């Protein structure tokens, strides 16, 4: 039960942080905010300060930032619709920025006590590895990229190598500050027990002592890795390598957090379980940031796309696109988004049965 509550709290905090981003940006840009609410449902507490009503509501599952002129036309000069394009842009992307920043801060806190980090240094080559030496690989080379994907962390190597593994990879390594391109092919090797196995023939993963600077560096790498995971997941979805049934909604994510928490607690205690959940929370925060910036109606990225289209219309025809069309498009997009959410939630529940 405790992990379910933690999962719900994580969702609530991340959504509230997202709305806080919109709120702070709106205030900074001079846009009137009619209500800023933490939580949903019946009001537990509210206070009006200036033009804004601040609310605390019963259900800890998010919040909202209701701006003047957000969903309707308004004659108020402080209405969202009457602002210049760059102010709208800042307001629209501020929520995603706050989610990304939250994910980064969580990772920074988790890495604050790190004593060392694994690197992508090649530490050993199989004696039968066919490409040793100046024209191939050498111990001490640092893996920089695989198949065009930048490698930041040790965990990136198996992730990227496992994507559409054909038995051949294009690898870029750093040696004495220079980038060297190599093409590697899996070979058949024999282990100490005489068993044959197929591998690329190199071992990687040096160790570097943690410092205040590289703690920040590796925190950034880890956060950008979460961005890449979202991108790769979307690519797999669009290419057909993954289906809609592979998606997880809030129910599935709560189930995953609960499972991770219980398994880790059984193996290493509650502290380790909480640490694992916080890593997961950081990934969810970054996921929310990226997904909200997709150029789809009803999402922040959709609003940014409309800004671009509207700017083109003004440049070409000297006339803005009426906001009523935006409202219709957003309404349709929201309905489709809710339909997808219901579908994913249904499948999450079926998986639990």
Enumerate the predicted regions with their spans.
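Small-residue-rich helix-interface/hinge motifs
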Residues: 2-75, 291-312
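Residue-level signature of transmembrane alpha-helical entry/exit and packing/kink sites
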Residues: 3-7, 83-92, 276-280
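Alpha-helical transmembrane segments of multi-pass membrane proteins
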Residues: 11-15, 66, 99, 283-293, ...
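Internal alpha-helical transmembrane segments
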Residues: 28, 52-55, 59-124, 330-332
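Functional transmembrane alpha-helices
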Residues: 79, 83, 189-288, 308-332, ...
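Membrane-helix cytosolic exit motif
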Residues: 106, 110, 338-351
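Conserved PDZ fold ligand-binding element
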Residues: 133-155
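PDZ-domain C-terminal substructure recognizer with occasional recognition of PDZ-binding tails
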Residues: 144-145, 159-199, 203
């Amino acid at each position: 039960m405790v992990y379910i509550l933690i999962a719900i709290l994580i969702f609530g905090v991340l959504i509230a942080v997202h709305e806080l981003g919109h709120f702070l940006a709106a205030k900074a840009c001079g846009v009137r905010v009619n209500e800023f609410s933490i939580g949903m449902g019946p009001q537990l507490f509210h206070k009006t300060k200036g033009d804004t009503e601040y609310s605390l509501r019963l259900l800890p599952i998010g919040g909202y930032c209701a701006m003047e002129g957000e969903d309707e036309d308004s004659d108020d000069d402080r209405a969202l619709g009457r602002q210049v394009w760059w102010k709208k842009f800042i307001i629209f992307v501020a929520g995603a920025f706050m989610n990304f920043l939250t994910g980064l801060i969580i990772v920074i806190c988790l890495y604050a006590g790190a004593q060392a980090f694994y690197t992508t240094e090649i530490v050993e080559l199989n004696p039968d590895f066919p490409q040793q030496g100046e024209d191939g690989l050498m111990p001490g080379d640092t893996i920089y990229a695989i198949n065009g994907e930048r490698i930041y962390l040790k965990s990136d190597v198996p992730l990227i190598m496992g994507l559409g593994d054909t038995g051949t990879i294009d690898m870029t390594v750093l040696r004495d500050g220079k980038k060297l391109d190599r093409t590697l092919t899996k070979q058949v090797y024999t282990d100490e027990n005489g068993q044959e196995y197929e591998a690329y023939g190199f071992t990687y993963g040096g160790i570097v002592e943690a410092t205040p600077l590289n703690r920040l560096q590796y925190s950034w790498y880890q956060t950008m890795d979460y961005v890449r995971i979202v991108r790769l997941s979307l690519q797999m979805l669009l290419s057909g390598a993954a289906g809609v049934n592979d998606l997880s909604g809030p129910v599935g994510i709560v189930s995953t957090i609960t499972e991770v928490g219980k398994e880790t607690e059984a193996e290493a205690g509650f502290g380790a379980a909480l640490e694992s959940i916080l890593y997961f929370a950081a990934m969810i925060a970054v996921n929310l940031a990226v997904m909200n910036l997709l150029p789809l109606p009803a999402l922040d990225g959709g609003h940014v796309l409309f800004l671009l289209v509207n700017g083109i219309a003004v440049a070409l025809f000297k006339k803005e696109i009426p906001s009523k069309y935006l409202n219709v498009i957003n309404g349709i997009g929201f309905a489709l988004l809710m339909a997808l959410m219901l579908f994913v939630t249904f499948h999450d529940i079926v998986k639990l049965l």
